[in-house]
Amino acid sequence: MTTAYYSTVLNHPLETVWTLIRDFNNYPAYIDGVTESVIEDDKSGDEIGAVRRFCYLGNWVRQRLAGHSDEGHSLTYAGIEPLPFPSGASPDAPAPTRYQGTMHLLPVVEGDRTFIEWTVTLDTAPQDAERWRTLFQSWIPDWTHSLERTLGLRT
C-alpha cells in the first residue's frame, strides 16, 4: 500500500471551488484530459454509491463515490477496476485495482481562498508501491492546477 498526497491554496472562495467539484460527474469540466464522464444507473453526482465512467487521455476509468459531504466539503472515490494506465506498464507490475482518493477543501479566511488537499491511497505490491506513489505524486498537482485554471476562467 502507498499514498500520494498534495495540498495547495487556491485563490478562489471555498463555495466557488466546492460548487465545481461536488458533482462526481463534473470531472470533464475541471480536469484536463477528461473528455467525457457518465454516471451509471441514473444516480446523481452526489449520491454515495454512484459509479462514474470517464475517459481520461483515451482510457476509460470506473470509480465509485465512496463518501460525499457538503458540510465537510469533501468527496471520496474508490477504484472499481484496475487502472488502465500508464500504457507502458509491465505485466509483472499490474495496475492497482483497489485505490481510494479524497479531495478535501477548507476555507482560508485571509483572502477568501481555499485550501485543497488531495490524497490517493493505492493497494499495490510492495515492489510497485514507490513507482505508483511517484506517478500519482506527479499527477495530483497537474489535476489541481487544471482545477485552478478552470476556476480562473469562471471568474
What are these regions (language model features)?
Residues 6-8, 62-67, 98-108, 120:
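Hydrophobic/aromatic beta-strand elements that line small-molecule binding cavities or substrate pockets
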Residues 10, 56-58, 109-111:
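A generic beta-sheet turn/junction motif
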Residues 29, 38-94, 142, 150-154:
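Glycine-rich portal/gate segments that line the openings of hydrophobic small-molecule binding cavities
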Residues 17-21, 27, 52, 65, ...:
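Hydrophobic pocket/interface hotspot
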Residues 12, 83, 105-107, 122-124:
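Beta-strand elements of well-folded, non-transmembrane domains
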Residues 14-15, 66-73, 104-115:
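A short, structured loop/turn motif at beta-sheet edges
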